[in-house]
Amino acid sequence: LWYYDNREDLKKVVRLHGKSTERDFYVGEKHRDEIIAMDTNHEGFPDSVHGYSLKSDRIEFLKGNNPENANYIAKFSELNTELCHILSSRNNALAQLYPPDGHISWHNNANASAYNIIFSWSETGDGCFKYIDGHTGNEVVMQDVKGWQCKAGYFGAYGEPWYNRV
């Protein structure tokens, strides 16, 4: 919860990606269907994200020459290393802090297929994780609850894509 506890300070130094006004389109059925129709022409990454990227190789600061930037990167590295050790994980693909109207658009992760563990914390329980079950083709909604939740699963490569959005 360090990021959540320090969210007001983070907002002053970390760039907020994307626009909340785009959310309905990018998490909607029309965009989902467009991404699925692209098949292997979809590169795997989401087209739109509205949130703060916190991973050290993706974080963007509002001021590039702020001496505090190094402290944020060091803190992320410390927390990321600790989490990877606890989980016996080699990589962490994503670390995001979403504003109340945040999102990640429909995508398939086929460019980085792997087993995933997704930890999220919700203040209100209003968010959700949606995915298309790669075996049945059905859309599944995993509604957030207040507090912590954990989701685990396999995001497949091309030929077995697992379309999802937050």
Q: Whereabouts are the PLM-identified features?
A:
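Catalytic core of non-heme Fe(II) oxygenases with the double-stranded beta-helix
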Residues: 89-162
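Short, intrinsically disordered, charge-balanced linker/junction segments flanking boundaries
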Residues: 1, 163-166
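Detector for Asparagine
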Residues: 6, 41, 65-71, 80, ...
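Non-heme Fe(II)/2-oxoglutarate
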Residues: 1-87
